[in-house]
A protein has these predicted regions:
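Mixed-charge (Asp/Glu-Lys/Arg
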Residues: 1-138
């Protein structure tokens, strides 16, 4: 039997989210919201209601909450499913790796931009968990 060799190409920076576990993508969104949007995460809310949101975070002044939802693969997110959370000043942050969003208004139901999150990751590599850094440093 002859040895077979296959040429592989190094993944591009733009492919990072496709390589990561869903939990890692959620971690990136959590860090982004805490650092860039200045939210504080209620860690006890992580996985309380996984069907609707990933966790609950609060604005630093306590005036409103945010409810992020993250989908990997080719899944899309529809803002109408989250309208009940986006009341009384509360916000919903949606992130789909596919970037397929419907019914988002940009005010209290917000679709996060993949390129912006990638830029965040690469400018904050030192804050990323080890599993994510392994992919970045490949």
């Amino acid at each position: 039997i002859r040895d077979r060799y296959y040429e592989t190409k190094k993944p591009s920076k733009d492919d990072l989210f496709e390589m990561l576990l869903p939990e890692d993508v959620e971690e990136i969104v959590s860090l982004y919201l805490q650092i860039k949007k200045e939210y504080l995460v209620y860690t006890s809310t992580n996985k309380l209601n996984t069907q609707t949101y990933e966790f609950v975070a609060v604005a630093r002044d306590g005036s409103y909450r945010c409810f992020p939802q993250v989908k990997t693969g080719g899944e899309s997110l529809n803002g109408n499913k989250y309208k009940h959370l986006a009341t009384n000043g509360n916000k919903v942050y949606l992130f789909a790796v596919s970037q397929n969003y419907n019914n988002i208004n940009g005010e209290n139901i917000i679709g996060l931009d993949k390129k912006e999150l990638l830029a965040f990751v690469y400018s904050h590599v030192n804050l990323m968990p080890e599993r994510i850094r392994l992919w970045i440093n490949e």
